[in-house]
A protein has these predicted regions:
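Catalytic core of pol beta-like nucleotidyltransferases
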Residues: 1-22, 30-36, 47-106
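Acidic Asp/Glu-based divalent-cation binding sites
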Residues: 39-41
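Short hydrophobic/aromatic beta-strand micro-patches
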Residues: 43-45
Length: 106
């Protein structure tokens, strides 16, 4: 099961793999509603990414050693800022409940 220590380990691994990025944990882990079925939902804001899909796959692989289910999304700060006030988007959810684990705020 995911706990606070696991979340911090995951964030540390992502910070090493994507220097200069902002990392926000959202979903049940951010709300403090972790259960045995929870996964770790993370949004990573990177300054420049050639392929968001390839980067999401790469960052998921970075978390494999933790042995937890994880959903890693990659976005630009511009996209986040544009959609964060629009209900029924993932960006809206992240803006409302996300926990920022990096000083470079989106």
């Amino acid at each position: 099961m995911i706990d606070e220590s696991t979340i911090k380990q995951a964030v540390g691994l992502l910070q090493q793999a994507a220097p200069g990025s902002s990392i926000i944990v959202f979903g049940s882990c951010a709300r403090g509603e972790i259960t045995a079925d929870s996964d770790l939902d993370v949004m990573v804001f990177e300054p420049t990414v050639t392929s968001r899909h390839e980067e999401m796959v790469r960052l998921r692989k970075v978390l494999r050693p933790l042995g937890i289910p994880a959903d890693v999304l990659v976005a630009s700060k511009d996209t986040f800022e544009y959609w964060s006030d629009t209900p029924n988007t993932i960006y809206y959810e992240v803006a409302r409940e996300g926990r920022v684990f990096d000083a470079a705020l989106p």
